[in-house]
Amino acid sequence: MMKSRTFRLSVSTLVGALVGVLMAIVGVYVTHSTEEPHTSLHEMLHDAVPLDSNEREILELKEEEFTARRREIESRLRAANGKLAESIAKNPQWSPEVEEATREVERAAADLQRATLVHVFEMRAGLKPEHRAAYDRVLVDALKRGSQ
């Protein structure tokens, strides 16, 4: 009786964790579509700040660099998620293999978040000082909307 209950609890916990990881990955893909290189933050920046040609050129280069970096990290995230799925398929309970695969997913997701923030601040540095306040407002507004 106790073993069966413990097993059900373990499986339920594992399924819940897997659903959480999958939801996080879906969120990453929805917010970082590879088909559209410009994020909504990028578009809002163009609407809020009158960029000159030099700023546009600088930001476009930074955007291209970030797109390549983001794709590399997203590839690692997909691979890590695949490892997690394989680990669970081999042994559908919390195990050292599932733990390690979960940590790989977490590392890749954290790397993506960090790279995105570095990119945001690199973009800001590419603006004229008089345009940075408007950029900051757009950034803060976007983050606030995302947290609601």
UniProtKB/Swiss-Prot annotation:
Keywords: Cadmium, Cadmium resistance, Cobalt, Nickel, Plasmid. It holds the Pfam family Metal_resist. The keyword Nucleotide-binding does not apply. GO terms for biological process: response to cadmium ion. Coiled coil: none annotated. InterPro entries: Metal_resist. The keyword Cytoplasm does not apply. To A.eutrophus CnrR. Component of the NCC cation-efflux system that confers resistance to nickel, cobalt and cadmium. May be involved in the regulation of NCC. This is Nickel-cobalt-cadmium resistance protein NccX. It comes from Alcaligenes xylosoxydans xylosoxydans (Achromobacter xylosoxidans). The gene is nccX.
